UniProtKB/Swiss-Prot annotation:
Record's protein name: Neurotoxin LmNaTx34.2
InterPro entries per UniProt: LCN-type_CS_alpha_beta_dom, Scorpion_toxin-like, Scorpion_toxin-like_sf, Scorpion_toxinL, Scorpion_toxinL/defensin
Family label: Belongs to the long (4 C-C) scorpion toxin superfamily. Sodium channel inhibitor family. Beta subfamily.
Subcellular location: Secreted
Domain notes: Has the structural arrangement of an alpha-helix connected to antiparallel beta-sheets by disulfide bonds (CS-alpha/beta).
Signal peptide interval: 1-18
Stated role: Binds voltage-independently at site-4 of sodium channels (Nav) and shift the voltage of activation toward more negative potentials thereby affecting sodium channel activation and promoting spontaneous and repetitive firing.
GO CC list: extracellular region
Organism whose genome encodes this protein: Lychas mucronatus (Chinese swimming scorpion)
Tissue and organ distribution: Expressed by the venom gland.
Xref: SUPFAM superfamilies: Scorpion toxin-like
Chain segments annotated as transmembrane: none
Amino acid sequence: MKTLILVVIALMVIEVKSDGYLMVRAGREKGCKIWCVINNEYCDKDCKLKGGNYGYCYFWKLACYCEGLPTSSPDIWTYEKNTCST
């Protein structure tokens, strides 16, 4: 029983991370993915500024992809948040 309680407490303490495309949150391109061609350094820097672990330029999608962002981060692009073409 003590082990079960310990496991439950440990799961509550562990922070859940998620991966996804970085999103522009202001200006003319608000709601769009942050685009790139081959600039891994820019994507990595921007990812880390937003609380992620590692970012890179996903060449086939021409967008910055970030790994290890907090799940509650508003910087993760989703279809629901896509206001790029409006």
